[in-house]
Amino acid sequence: NNVALISPRRIGKTDLLHQCFRQPEIKEKYHTFVIDIYATSSVRDFVNVFGKAVLDELRPKGKSVWEGFLNVLSSLRSEISFDINGQPTWGIGLGAITNPIATLDEIFHYLNHADKPCLIAIDEFQQITKYGDDANIEAALRTYIQRCHNSHFVFSGSHRHLMGAIFTS
């Protein structure tokens, strides 16, 4: 079952989601992801934020957990950076996403085959209506979500009319 959570901005939807996902009984049984897409303006941005949120959430759970995600993504890159003291640090992140829909397909493939069920909250979900680069993103996401039997979604938004239009069309 999926849920839409709609209220004005700055009311506490995001804090509520984080609080729910921090509950021990949720953390034990599910992989949880909160994806804030407010600052996204394209499908590519959305896919980048989505993939990064999944990777960042899985990384502390151990190598075997996040390796499962890394193995399905083709748009990965290794990165070397330097901390404030000049010490090099190595990491893995999302690289250039040349085909956002293919990468989205890979992310949903992982979610559907993860070792535990997944709870995914997409915050400011109405933002997808503003993506000019792919008018079909709503239909694509609807299809992915309907076929993703290992995950449940919370669609959080602050614009009632846009959220209503998404879920009634």
Question: Language-model features: where?
Answer:
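Catalytic NTP-binding/metal-coordinating core of nucleotidyl cyclase/transferase enzymes
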Residues: 163
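P-loop NTPase nucleotide-binding core
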Residues: 2-3, 7-11, 15-119
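Conserved Walker B catalytic segment
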Residues: 2, 90-160, 168
